[in-house]
Structure formats: C-alpha cells, structure tokens
UniProtKB/Swiss-Prot annotation:
Superkingdom in the source lineage: Bacteria
Residue numbers binding Zn(2+) 1: 55, 57, 117, 134
Subunit and partners: Monomer.
Any one GO biological process: methylglyoxal catabolic process to D-lactate via S-lactoyl-glutathione
Swiss-Prot/TrEMBL keywords: Hydrolase, Metal-binding, Zinc
Protein name as it appears in the record: Hydroxyacylglutathione hydrolase
Length: 263
C-alpha cells in the first residue's frame, strides 16, 4: 500500500512523503526545507531513498544539498532536464522517458511535461496520485513566471484528462484564497459553494485541504473551465473595456489569469 504524508514547510508549502508499505525507504517531493524532512525521517525511523523535483524554485529545491549530505550522497534525485537545479542525479525528459520505476515502489511513475509556471515544470503520477508542484492548485493554477498562457492552458488540460478519481497533491495550501477568486468569477456554482464551506471548516481546524481530486477540480476550478458560459460572462464583465467579439478559450484563460494576478 502506498501512503502519502504531508510535511508542512515555510508558510504554506507541502513536502510530500511517499512510502510503499512495508518498506521503510521513502521518497519526498519538492523538499524546499531539509530540516523538517530530517525531523520526520528520524521521528518515524525511515530512510530517504530519493527526491522528486517538479521545478527549480528554491522553496521546492532548497533542501536537496543538505538531504544528500545527510544521506551520505546516496540519494537518487529526479527532476526536469531543462532547468538549472543543483543536485539532480537523474534528469528527466517526459517525452523521452515518460515512465520509470522507483526502487521500493510498486508500479510505474509517470512523468508529465507541464510548462507554464516555469519553462521546464514537470509533474508525476504514481498509482492514483498526481504530484503537480505549482501547476494545478485546488481551485486555481500557478502564476506564469516563465511560460505562456497557451502552455499553461495545455498543461492544465492534460492534467484534467487524468482519471476522475486521481488525487491531486499540489505543493501549496492556497485553496482558501483560490476559492475566493473562483467564487468571484463563478458565484452560482453550487459545487464550488459547497467546497468553499468545507475548505473553510478544514482551515479553521488547521487541517489541509489537500489532496483534492481531478473530478472536484473539473467541477470547481475556473482555470479548468475557462470556456464555461458563466465564467466567460464574468470575464467579459470584468474586462468590459475590451472587445470580446472573438474571445476564444485561450483568450478567456489569459484574461482569467490576468484577473487573478491582480485580485
């Protein structure tokens, strides 16, 4: 059985720990902070076997060197082959190597090319779990620091095509703020209203809203539904000074991301 555990880091990061029972060797996803990972390993008598990196931002990679030293340079470190990340031992290209196997893990690890937030961002799927870094958030998506709106839209559409029961393990607890924006854009969405109430209740108890599921995100995430009639109407109303005669899905998505950036 694969167990997935969250380690909180910084203000709102999640570092995900993957453990295939009964093994005591584990993998971590995007360890921006080594100290919290080491504390978790030692408290649970676990050994770190490897690291999965989604992109180069320091809050996702900052702990790699210290964890490698802690593990006496025995770690396998996976990450995108077209981003400058110190410490990667196994650079990945999703086109050339879309699947691989990990020691101590059952089944294959699928690698997805999801540029947008950064130019080389990748995501991982193992069993029914998606680790998508800063590409897809619950109720939102990542800012476009390096990629284009077209790249991000394509990446999100790719993720939205995963099986509905796929669990979404993003890297930040941004759900509450994302849902505020989603409700401004899509106020009559009952599924969104219900999810917002659940998210508020969870955060009041200091509990994580993650993981989400692909099914839920298809229903409530405006960035997966940029061509929905109510969302298109909201975009046109918000950007009323623009000519929307030929507004297509990419144009709507671009304006939606611009709106969120200034929300």
């Amino acid at each position: 059985m694969l167990t997935i555990t969250a380690i909180k880091a910084f203000n709102d990061n999640y570092i995900w720990v993957l453990q295939q029972q009964p093994h005591t060797q584990v993998y971590v996803v995007d360890p921006g902070d080594a100290s919290v990972v080491i504390d978790y390993l030692e408290a649970n008598q676990l050994t770190l076997a490897g690291i999965l990196l989604t992109h180069h931002h320091n809050d996702h990679t900052g702990g790699v060197a210290e964890l490698q030293a802690y593990s006496q340079d025995r770690l396998t470190v996976y990450g995108p082959d077209n981003e400058k990340i110190e410490g990667i031992t196994h650079p990945l290209n999703a086109t050339a190597q879309p699947r691989l196997t990990l020691d101590y893990m059952s089944g294959e690890l699928q690698v997805l090319d999801v540029p947008g937030h950064t130019a080389g961002h990748i995501a991982y799927v193992i069993a029914d779990a998606l680790f998508c870094g800063d590409t897809l958030f619950s109720g939102g998506c990542g800012r476009l620091f390096e990629g284009t709106p077209a790249q991000m839209l394509n990446s999100l559409q790719q993720l939205a095509q995963l099986p509905a029961d796929t669990r979404v393990y993003c890297a930040h607890e941004y759900t509450f703020s994302n849902l505020k924006f989603a409700l401004a854009v899509n106020p009559n969405n009952r599924a969104l209203q219900d999810y917002n109430e659940r998210a508020i209740a969870l955060r009041r108890q200091d509990k994580a809203t993650i993981p989400s599921t692909i099914a839920l995100e298809r229903a409530i995430n405006p960035f997966l539904r940029a061509s929905d009639t109510e969302i298109v109407d909201s975009i046109k109303q918000h950007f009323s000074d623009l000519n929307h005669a030929n507004l297509d899905e990419l144009g709507g998505f671009t304006l939606l991301r611009q709106w969120k950036d200034n929300f």
